[in-house]
Regions:
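Positively charged n-region of N-terminal signal peptides that target proteins for export
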Residues: 1-4
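Bacterial Sec-dependent N-terminal signal peptides
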Residues: 15-36, 90-92, 96-99
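Activation targets extended, charge/polar-rich intrinsically disordered C-terminal tails
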Residues: 25, 33, 42-43, 50, ...
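N-terminal mature-domain "stem" immediately C-terminal to a signal peptide or N-terminal signal-anchor/transmembrane
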Residues: 25-63
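Non-catalytic propeptide/linker segments at domain boundaries
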Residues: 49-114
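Glycine-rich catalytic cores of cysteine/serine-nucleophile enzymes that process amide/ester linkages
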Residues: 118-195, 228-240
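Active-site nucleophile-His-acid catalytic modules used for acyl/amide transfer and hydrolysis
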Residues: 189-269
Length: 329
């Protein structure tokens, strides 16, 4: 696991530059080796070769060389990474430039904004951010939920719903959204705290996040993963430089004293694009040992679960009750 993280961290450094040469005329297929199921004589050399080829895949993700790198890996090792890559590329290209969750649907005029600390969750595939994270994240619940925010009721103005009042993440990193933004999401639900809250403690937690959410504070970045396209380099919860929306929500409640990351067993991680590529990588690296392969995959997913705060994990948290939901696709 540690070797993989080091490899991926190195690979993630380079995402631009001259086009790489992925020549299919010189590819040496290893399919027969893998099909044999017999461990190679030099396991260390095999793992180094696989790691080097996989590093090229990581380097190419998000560039013009992506399709070629994935196809080369497939041709050499008999995997189907190109299918996963095609879905990822389509996600990145989909409806570029829209706000997170902005939609063609009518505004949700009945969405409530009346509970301090209420959590707002949205999903759907009508924008670029949504399609990318929808591809990466497991999809267990109706709504394809991926985005989140937490309401600071003291900032909400019922006479002007264009004021910033929901702590979340935007393109700069941590930031604010408006009630008007949320009325125009694709799919959405509202979660109220299931237990009574101490206002002074909640105010303190919201004030802490306000430092990062301040629209003039740009000493940070947005990302579900470090370097954005490197889907393996997961941002940790403790990191206060790289923010994504549900991590902001988690921080508010963590400061309050609640851990709202449920890590629910109801969430099926095998439905995620992240799982698909990790599975293919380890299936090649440890083709001769299903025990090693399965353990490596399990260890990686366990690490991802520990660090990632999914919208679905917040929806399934016992700290909240769902009081509103509107699923339109």
């Amino acid at each position: 696991m540690k070797k993989l993280l080091i490899l991926l961290a190195v690979a993630a450094v380079v995402f631009v530059g001259c086009a790489k040469d992925f020549s299919f005329d010189t590819v040496e297929s290893k399919k027969d080796v893998i099909d044999s199921g017999v461990a190679p004589e030099d396991i260390a050399a095999w793992e180094s070769e696989v790691d080097a080829d996989f590093a090229k895949v990581m380097e190419a993700l998000g560039t013009e060389d992506e399709a070629s790198a994935l196809a080369y890996f497939d041709a050499k090792y008999g995997t189907e990474m190109s299918k996963t890559g095609a879905r990822y590329a389509a996600a990145r290209a989909g409806s570029s430039g829209k706000k997170s969750g902005s939609s063609k649907y009518p505004a949700m005029t009945n969405m409530p904004f009346n509970k301090d600390g209420a959590v707002y969750i949205s999903g759907g595939t009508d924008d670029m951010v949504g399609t990318v994270i929808d591809w990466v994240s497991p999809k267990t619940l109706p709504g394809s939920y991926y985005h989140g925010a937490v309401l600071d009721l003291d900032k909400y103005d019922p006479n002007n719903e264009s004021v910033y009042c929901l702590e979340t993440a935007i393109t700069k990193g941590a930031g604010y959204e408006t009630a008007d933004d949320w009325r125009n999401k694709v799919n959405a639900c509202v979660l109220n705290p299931a237990y009574s809250m101490t206002k002074s403690k909640l105010d303190s937690a919201q004030a802490y996040m306000d430092y990062y959410c301040d629209m003039n504070n740009k000493n940070m970045e947005y990302g579900f993963f470090k370097n954005t396209v490197n889907i393996f380099n997961v941002v940790t919860k403790a990191d206060t430089y790289t923010w994504y929306c549900t991590k902001v929500v988690w921080w508010v409640y963590n400061k309050y004293g609640w851990d709202i990351d449920s890590n629910s067993s109801r969430i099926d991680w095998t439905t995620s694009g992240l799982y698909t590529i990790v599975k293919d990588y380890y299936a090649v690296r440890y083709f001769y040992s299903s025990k090693k392969k399965n353990q490596a995959i399990a260890d990686y997913i366990a690490t991802a679960k520990q660090n990632i705060v999914l919208a679905e994990e917040i929806v399934l948290s016992p700290y909240f009750n769902k009081v509103y939901e509107n699923i339109r696709e």
